Amino acid sequence: MEANKIIITGGATRIGAAIARKLSGPKKEILIHYNKSKSKAEALKKELEKKGTIIYLVKGDLSKEVDVNKIVKFAKSKLKYFDCLVNNASLFENDKLDNFTTDSWGRHLRTNLRTPALLSKEFSKNIKGKNNNIINIIDQRVFKLTPYFFSYTISKTGLYTLTKTSAMNFAPNIRVNGIAPGPTIKNKRQSDKHFKKQYLATPLKKQVDVNEICNAVDFFIKNSSI
């Protein structure tokens, strides 16, 4: 089983770009969403087109419903129908309960939870056959709660619940799964020391290899019983 009509949000950089590389191949069509990483999106497009992949790029701010609607319209016009949606994009800003703002709260909830829900709804209306997948990139913070990154963690906890409830709702024609990575790629605001401390606090005491996340995505797509 393969995915051939793929949408990846936040697909121009980091984990999203790695997933795009993993799922690319001759005659496959991938729509890569980006927001501020236009040059990286264009470079990735050129790279993947050399493998015979058809790449479509679309810009959008996922905290704005008008942009989400634009992305859906563009996806329908290019792909015609869908068989894989990877909700990878996320907003990641640090705040706590005692200093969060309604603006930050709203942007996190809209970007990290409302948009995956809206895209999942539209995905379900534009599929063919029974081998269709939605894969949500969550976060290990959902299972190891801390008071840090408050708005982000709340939004990802909601995405975890969305994953479980949409799996029930969309079965059997759409399988919905989530991946909750541990420390994978150092955030640009992190020091090397802080990042190392973060992954050493995990049971395996190692940084996650992004290729392992990509392999998990591929496994979900190819295994019709999950």
Predicted feature residues:
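C-terminal substrate-recognition "lid" of short-chain dehydrogenase/reductases
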Residues: D209-I226
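The beta1-alpha1 cofactor-binding region of Rossmann-like NAD(H)/NADP(H)-dependent oxidoreductases
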Residues: K38, K59-K70, T102, N211
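Conserved glycine-rich cofactor-binding loop
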Residues: A12-R14
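Catalytic loop of short-chain dehydrogenase/reductase
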Residues: N133-A171, P183-T184
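Substrate-binding pocket helix/loop in short-chain dehydrogenase/reductase
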Residues: K96-L97, T101-G106, Q198
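Conserved glycine-rich Rossmann-like NAD(P)H-binding loop of the short-chain dehydrogenase/reductase
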Residues: K28-E42
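Conserved NAD(P)H cofactor-binding loop of Rossmann-fold oxidoreductase domains
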Residues: N88-E93
